[in-house]
Structures are given as C-alpha cells and as structure tokens.
Amino acid sequence: MSAVAPDGRKMLRLEVRNSQTPIERKPEWIKTRAKMGPEYTKMQNLVKSEGLHTVCQEAGCPNIYECWEDREATFLIGGDQCTRRCDFCQIDTGKPEALDRDEPRRVGESVVTMDLNYATITGVARDDLPDGGAWLYAETVRQIHEQTAGREAGRTKVELLAPDFNAVPELLREVFESRPEVFAHNVETVPRIFKRIRPGFRYERSLKVITDARDFGLVTKSNLILGMGETREEISEALKQLHEAGCELITITQYLRPSVRHHPVERWVKPQEFVELKEEAEQIGFSGVMSGPLVRSSYRAGRLYGMAMEQRRSATV
C-alpha cells in the first residue's frame, strides 16, 4: 500500500525515506518568549478585525512579536501550491490555481490598512506561467509603493523574497524595475547538498540572480539554513561565495523540520556558533547580519535594510 501525504496525494520516495526518521526533540535554546508591546497588540487586533492574512501569524513565526512591534509583516503571493519542491519547505508542491491578477492590489490594501513601515513579499515558484510569475512579483511591489505614497510616516519599504525566474534576463529585469528596497533570493544551503535539498534550483544560478540584482543597483540579501547536513567549513565557503556574488545582507538560521515528510534535522547548531558566524560574516564584509536559531529571513528586515543603506552612504563619503 502506497504511503499517502496529508493532502491526499501519494508520497514521494524521498518523503517516504524522510518519514522513517521521527521528528527530533528540540534543544532547550530553541524557544521564544512572547513580548506583546503596544504596537503588536494594535496589529493583532487590526489583522483579526479586518480579516487580513500574513505569513507571520499563519506560519506561527516565533518573531512575530518583535516584527509587528516594528510594524513589519510578511505576505505570501502566488497561491499555496509551488511548482518546485524543497526538502525543508512546508509549502505544498502541486499544480497552482490560475493567476489571481487582483492579488497585488489586495496586498497593497492590507499594507495600507496595517500602516506598515516595511513589508516583505515572498511567494511560490510559478513555473506554470510563461513569465514565471515575474509580473505578479513586480506588480505587488508597484502596488505597495503606489498605495502608500502619501503615508504620513513615509512610503512603505518593500523587500521582495523571490524565486530565480530561471535567471531569464527579461524576467529578472521586469522584477528589478519595480524597484523593491531589497531584493532577496535565498540559496538556503551549501553546494554539496544543494541539489538534494533544492532539486528545482541551481546554486550557481542563484548566485547569478543575486549578482544581477546587485548590478542593477538593488540592495541584495540571502539566507542560509543550518542543520541539513552541511559542515562548518562549507558554511564559511558559502558565505564567501555569496559576498563575492554581490550579496550585502545575510540571515543565518537553524533548520526546524515542518513534518516527518521533510528532511531530518542533521544537527542542532549551538547559540555560540551562530555568534561566531555573525562575526565571521561581518569580517567577510556583509553590511548586515542576523544570525541565530530562531532568526528567519524576514527577521528585523527593516533594520538590516538600514544597515545596508548606511554602508552605502559611508562608501560614497
């Protein structure tokens, strides 16, 4: 009898193999404290009363208290089905719904309603679309910028966490021309295990996307997830390669397994190693680094953007 995933489909062989390893027990340092400040409480009430949806609350992000206190939030676009499968990601792989061309406008309205200082837009890969979803990502940035142009506290800044669009120059250009304050593309892991963890992507292609974004003049960002089988030396090498590719901002985090169908946790990285990696990344030359067990790629995103801009200003003096 074939193993069946929760969504009713037949499980992939990789998922069956992953399922043979029970969910790992988290160490004591993988925990967070709820610090509900006044801005967080306002945001929580607003999201509930207006029926808004953010990745922050729907994914149970441990950093929601800090981010919402800073009036920062993350939105997922493109639907809930991805055309690629990464072995760490909880988003389902399958055939997406038809493109919702009104979604960018609605996301913009949500940003206005929440009065955000900084919005991170992420989404699924849409290889089913002729443009890979490039218009959708670009239009969402445009809508947020247009709808918040008259905001008293200043236009909402947008960070776009995008797929690679197969590194097609025309598609990347369309996205870049929407001028997000930050263009993020996450490599997530090191070259040796990249194909196993992210079979739909290519490491060198991801580096090229980051280089192209930097050459276009955008602030660039990426993320590394630790605990999926990489070595300490490989992390250091990946950091150097990312910086050489033009990456300015980096987040480094611990892999937390979403379910038994996903890649097992190979190791729990101790807090001290995250401290050491932060220092190493800063020495390599990254403008801003967030490194810790519960850091996520959108964690303190506005603060990291500020670090990049400060570094750029210093370089021109």
Swiss-Prot record:
Subcellular localization, as worded in the UniProt entry: Cytoplasm
Catalytic activity entry: [[Fe-S] cluster scaffold protein carrying a second [4Fe-4S](2+) cluster] + N(6)-octanoyl-L-lysyl-[protein] + 2 oxidized [2Fe-2S]-[ferredoxin] + 2 S-adenosyl-L-methionine + 4 H(+) = [[Fe-S] cluster scaffold protein] + N(6)-[(R)-dihydrolipoyl]-L-lysyl-[protein] + 4 Fe(3+) + 2 hydrogen sulfide + 2 5'-deoxyadenosine + 2 L-methionine + 2 reduced [2Fe-2S]-[ferredoxin]
Keywords, alphabetical: 4Fe-4S, Cytoplasm, Iron, Iron-sulfur, Metal-binding, S-adenosyl-L-methionine, Transferase
Pathway involvement of the protein, from the record: Protein modification; protein lipoylation via endogenous pathway; protein N(6)-(lipoyl)lysine from octanoyl-[acyl-carrier-protein]: step 2/2
Gene Ontology cellular component annotations, sorted alphabetically: cytoplasm
EC number: 2.8.1.8
GO molecular function, one term: 4 iron, 4 sulfur cluster binding
Name of this protein: Lipoyl synthase
Matching HAMAP family: Lipoyl_synth
SUPFAM superfamilies (alphabetical): Radical SAM enzymes (SSF102114)
Domain Radical SAM core: start-end pairs: 68-287
Residues at which [4Fe-4S] cluster 2 binds: 82, 86, 89
Entry's cofactor comment: Binds 2 [4Fe-4S] clusters per subunit. One cluster is coordinated with 3 cysteines and an exchangeable S-adenosyl-L-methionine.
InterPro entries the record matches: Aldolase_TIM, Elp3/MiaA/NifB-like_rSAM, LIAS_N, Lipoyl_synth, rSAM
Pfam families linked: LIAS_N (PF16881), Radical_SAM (PF04055)
Family: Belongs to the radical SAM superfamily. Lipoyl synthase family.
Keyword Cytoplasm: yes
Cofactor annotation: [4Fe-4S] cluster
Originating species: Streptomyces coelicolor (strain ATCC BAA-471 / A3(2) / M145)
Binding site for [4Fe-4S] cluster 1: 56, 61, 67, 298
Keyword hit for Iron-sulfur: yes
